């Protein structure tokens, strides 16, 4: 009797051990299945991330190619212009000691602005934010040649007024605003190839003279189109 009871207990103990082993194997299989699924999900997420990064790079290349083509249409050097724009976007100062060309005057700006270019052919290109920008003469970077923004009480609380909606300025003819100007006048607002804003309209601009050259003193009323 005792032997039979002992054999029965041994059998039960062995059965319980086998059941525990089976449960452990099932649990491990489930863990491995979950781990495999997690690895697969991470792999898919990595593929999607790489695909998005590649698409972003392609989009950047397309924007640079488009900007270069538009810069070239203006008769400027795409490589120099793009380098300057990239530097300004990052808040850097443009290289005043190495101007884009021998006849151009261009911007030494704060990091609030993209760029302002000024050349000897009396053509001005203003890009995006107007906030106390000072253009420098290439022969004498310490002398302000043109100032945009300045102090205008009509602007109200914002230092830049509504000038963010101005995307590009074309300077023509020989008279505007406060008096005669050998530089030209603001006769139109045109699309700016370097800005996400396509066009705008300027409601009021006044000119004043800095040294021997006039400057745009204020842009105090603008409307997006």
UniProtKB/Swiss-Prot annotation:
Per the record, the coiled-coil ranges are none
Q: Where in the cell is it found?
A: Virion; Host cytoplasm
Asked if the Swiss-Prot or TrEMBL record annotates the protein with the keyword Transmembrane, the reply is no
**GO CC annotation:** host cell cytoplasm; viral capsid, decoration
- Keywords of this entry: Capsid decoration protein, Capsid protein, Host cytoplasm, Virion
Q: Which domain of life is it from?
A: Viruses
Is-annotated flag, keyword Zinc?
Answer: no
Complexes and interactors: Homooligomer. The portal-like structure consists in 12 copies of VP2. Interacts with capsid protein VP1.
> What is recorded about the domains?
The N-terminus domain points away from the virion surface.
Q: What does this protein do?
A: Minor structural protein that forms a portal-like structure at a unique three-fold axis of symmetry, following binding to the host receptor. The channel formed by VP2 may allow the delivery of the viral genome through the host endosomal membrane.
The note filed under miscellaneous reads: Translated by a ribosomal termination-reinitiation process from the bicistronic mRNA coding for VP1 and VP2.
| Protein name (Swiss-Prot/TrEMBL) | Minor capsid protein VP2
Organism of this sequence: Bovine enteric calicivirus Newbury agent-1 (isolate Bovine/UK/Newbury1/1976) (BEC)
